[in-house]
Design a protein with these regions (language model features):
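An N-terminally biased module of ancient metal coordination in phosphate/nucleic-acid-related enzymes
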Residues: 1-105, 110-113, 117, 194-203, ...
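Short, well-structured secondary-structure segments
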Residues: 47-51, 126, 222-225
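Conserved, mostly hydrophobic/aromatic
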Residues: 18, 39, 125, 187, ...
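Extended substrate/RNA-proximal surfaces in nucleic-acid metabolism proteins
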Residues: 73-218
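Active-site-adjacent C-terminal substructures of enzyme catalytic domains
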Residues: 208-268
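Glycine/Thr-rich phosphate-binding loops of Rossmann-like dinucleotide-binding domains
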Residues: 57, 135, 233
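Glycine-rich nucleotide phosphate-binding loop and flanking beta-alpha elements
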Residues: 23, 105, 133, 229-231
């Protein structure tokens, strides 16, 4: 049943709903047109560029490389380039110019201000949690195993990292980010990116995850069916997998397949993983 459901996401929608660009500081230098040509090559009918929204004012990027999001000065270039590609390829593929919004606990006002200013220009969007607030500051949960270890040390245990992550997802869902708040939740199990290094049976959190899924269902939101975890040596999992996927299917929560490509070559992984 699960495999049939996943295949339907690809075959009937033929959409990649999670793609980054050269405007992502931690991505490749492949330009937006490279991604478009790859999407056409692999038979997609629709694609969404979802570049990281700039971080809110006065928030210091916790990434050691300070490369979490697009620079605010580049938003107009991103939009203009996307619009040119929409026109150029309008007879071959539908191109959405969207955004991936980082929910950051305590910075809801700043995020809302950014969305109020730029949200009208985006036709697709993802709401994600990449950063969590610890006792000593903020951390990127997906940067490296070394950074992940620092989060464990700050919060006291791996168990508490999972607890904090899912609590932050709930905060993101319930937050008031204005009328342009994205309604698709990104890579729900991103906290498991380094599960090979930090193995953990998160079955105890299934009730909390079910609460998250119930909120998503009640709000009419979607899930980012993100396959990037399969490419990560420390993960080798879908970011919606196992019992979590079972519950999402049972609740009939819409999902949008996403390669989460930071390089054009990963567009093809939509088909390869099947």
């Amino acid at each position: 049943m699960k495999l049939d459901y996943i295949r339907n996401l690809v075959e009937f929608k033929r959409k990649d709903g999670h793609i980054h660009t050269q405007y992502c500081p931690h991505g490749s230098k492949d330009n937006m047109e490279d991604y478009v040509e790859e999407a056409i090559k692999y038979g997609l009918d629709e694609m969404s560029f979802t570049e990281h929204l700039p971080l809110p004012k006065n928030f210091e990027d916790p990434s050691p490389l300070k490369d979490s999001a697009m620079e605010i000065e580049k938003i107009e270039k991103y939009l203009k380039e996307g619009q040119l590609l929409q026109e150029k390829y309008k007879d071959k593929i539908k191109i959405n110019i969207g955004v991936e919004v980082d929910y950051i606990e305590g910075y809801e006002k700043g995020i809302k201000e950014l969305l109020n200013k730029y949200g009208v220009f985006f036709s697709d969007g993802i709401l994600s949690v990449h950063m969590i607030k610890g006792n000593k500051g903020y951390y990127c949960i997906d940067f490296s195993t070394e950074e992940f270890q620092k989060i464990i040390e700050d919060l006291g245990s791996l168990d508490e990292v999972y607890n904090k992550y899912y609590d932050t997802i709930i905060m993101a869902l319930e937050s008031d980010l204005g009328p342009y708040k994205p309604k698709r939740i990104g890579h729900l199990n991103l906290v498991r990116k380094f599960n090979k290094e930090f193995p953990y049976d998160y079955a105890k959190y299934l009730p909390k995850i079910e609460k998250i899924l119930n909120i998503i269902k009640e709000k009419g939101y979607e899930l980012d069916f993100n396959i990037a975890g399969l490419r990560k040596e420390g993960c080798r999992e879908l970011y919606v997998e196992g019992k979590v996927l079972d519950m999402a299917i049972e609740k009939e929560i819409p999902m949008v397949l996403g390669s989460d490509s930071h390089s054009a070559k990963y567009i093809k992984t939509l088909k390869e993983f099947l």
